[in-house]
A protein has these predicted regions:
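Iron-sulfur-cluster electron-transfer modules
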Residues: 3-212
Length: 212
């Protein structure tokens, strides 16, 4: 192999075939994790080549979602206009076969969160970026289930105002090789745990890829 083969465009095209399902790790006798290798590869690749705008948008969603939330009413009205979806497909390769998610009002989630009984048993509920912005009903149901079993759900950014934006697992960064940013997100989560004395509190969630 040439000296720079590891960060070549040919290797990029090969790694693009990996969809991150981790079937390789489960099925391979040596437990080779191509998904992890892809993240490591992209980390080095993007030091040499620029990242596509589409990939930048998706990978940085946890930090930049607030921009969409600022114009949520407008976004929700125009998101399914056919011509707009066609433009997004041409510019960013977002398929027109899928509808854009609707940015949801977070008030119903806050209402049920702050109305919880003060159970002695507590768990930290990792409210992932997609659910806390687009599918809050999933989190509402999760809180109800936890309460039925006698647990109070703690959503970090509702519990600690100093956090600013919600905590993130860094999954989108890992998928696009931005391992330094993913590490920074995990450090935020670790700091929250330590600063609030939650070292012995279990962490639960509803998005497996965020927890694993």
């Amino acid at each position: 192999l040439p000296k720079d083969a590891f960060v070549s465009k040919e290797m990029f095209e090969t790694m693009e075939l990996c969809v991150g399902c981790k079937a390789c790790q489960r099925e391979c006798p040596m437990s080779v994790d191509i998904s992890k290798m892809k993240s490591e590869f992209l980390f080095h690749y993007y030091k040499k080549f620029s990242m596509k705008l589409k990939d930048k948008i998706i990978s940085n969603m946890p930090k930049n979602i607030w921009l969409i939330k600022l114009i949520a009413p407008i976004f929700n009205k125009i998101k399914n206009i056919p011509i707009l979806n066609k433009v997004l497909e041409l510019l960013f390769n977002f398929s027109t076969k899928r509808t854009m998610p609707e940015v949801q009002n977070i008030s119903p989630l806050k209402n049920i969160y702050y109305s919880q009984n003060n159970f002695s048993n507590k768990v930290i509920l990792l409210a992932d970026t997609f659910n806390i912005n687009f599918e809050i009903q999933n989190l509402i149901y999760t809180i109800k289930v936890l309460n039925k079993f006698g647990y109070k759900a703690i959503i970090p950014n509702f519990d600690d105002d100093s956090l600013g934006r919600p905590l993130c697992c860094g999954r989108t960064y890992i998928s696009y090789g931005q391992l330094d940013k993913a590490q920074a997100e995990m450090q935020r989560f670790t700091n929250y745990i330590i600063n609030n004395n939650y070292e012995s509190t279990p962490v639960v969630g509803i998005e497996p890829s965020c927890l694993l």
